[in-house]
Design a protein with these regions (language model features):
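Active-site loop architecture of trypsin-fold serine endopeptidases
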Residues: 2-27, 33-70, 74-79, 138, ...
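Short beta-strand scaffold segments in enzyme catalytic cores
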Residues: 29-30, 156
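C-terminal recognition in membrane/secretory proteostasis and scaffolding
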Residues: 37, 62-280
Length: 280
């Protein structure tokens, strides 16, 4: 029932439904034929804004985590952090490790201080199941972790060198180190109207950052601002300005406070490094 990659959320695992969902009833309950709650209506696929028979609901297992966080007084939902980069298992990879079909999530890289590394996961491992629940792809793994509460451990079934092994992974949140230090840029510059935060494991996960290990993240862009006009996007990582590295929000704030005849800006977007030059 669940569909991923809808582009609606960072934890984009939804129940797809043909129930009519319109702006007025989003947030309502999605129930089965026995009146059991299975999800909360969240979004529709529509160009007109009205229902066209393709709707999406947040699965009830994820809703439970949000409710528990609210009851405990939390200001945000903290989800378990794996500390690993994952990729889809291709047919060629599946054949090479003895799988009869492409399933699971391949470990491509790891944070040396993350839960994956602590548990003994290695590059090239394929995560096949979480607590006995089969994993089809990286998005499926994200969903399984997203329904877990912080604290304790979860059991991974891993394929390594043609053999299955069990590993216990700690359920801990992504650390926010360095601190977020949110700054909104109002100085005349290509970034005017953008809100930036420091890059950390927590903000990288929150804004779906891929590949970047240094820089600051664009968290928000005001409509009709200079940053919007220049097509900067939420989740872009600003790595350097005029070949000077940007390590923190304060670095960027100081840089835009100076006059420049031109702006050579290098960003990371979706794992790709892009460089653009703008007039001063």
């Amino acid at each position: 029932l669940a569909r991923t990659q809808t582009g609606i959320s960072d934890y984009g695992f939804f129940i797809q439904t043909d129930a009519a969902i319109n702006p007025g009833n989003s947030g309502g309950a999605l129930v089965d034929s026995k009146a059991r709650l299975i999800g909360i209506n969240s979004a529709i696929f529509s160009k007109s804004g009205g229902s066209v028979g393709i709707g999406f609901a947040i699965p009830v297992n994820m809703v439970k985590i949000v409710i528990a966080a609210a009851k405990s007084g939390g200001k945000q939902v903290r989800r378990p952090w794996l500390g690993a980069s994952l990729q889809v298992v291709s047919k060629e990879i599946a054949d090479s490790i003895g799988l009869d079909r492409p399933v699971g999530a391949l470990v491509a890289d790891m944070n040396p201080k993350g839960p994956a590394a602590d548990a003994g996961l290695k590059r090239g491992d394929v995560i096949m199941a979480v607590d006995g629940q089969a994993i089809d792809d990286p998005e499926g793994l994200g969903y399984r972790l997203g329904t877990k509460s912080i604290g304790g451990t979860t059991e991974f079934t891993v394929m390594r060198s043609g053999k299955k092994t069990q590993l216990s992974v700690k359920l801990v949140p992504a650390p926010e180190t360095p601190a977020r230090d949110s700054v909104t840029i109002d100085a005349p510059s290509p970034f005017m109207g953008a809100t930036i935060v420091n890059l950390s494991p927590a903000t990288a996960e929150e804004y779906s950052v891929e590949g970047a290990s240094q820089g600051v993240v664009i968290a928000q862009i005001a409509p009709d601002s200079q940053a919007a006009a220049l097509n900067f996007q939420r989740g872009d990582v600003v790595m350097s300005i005029n070949d000077a590295k940007i390590e923190t929000t304060r670095d960027l704030e100081k840089t835009v406070g100076k006059r420049h005849y031109f702006w050579k800006i290098t960003i990371s977007r979706g794992g790709q490094v892009l460089t653009s030059v703008f007039g001063g």
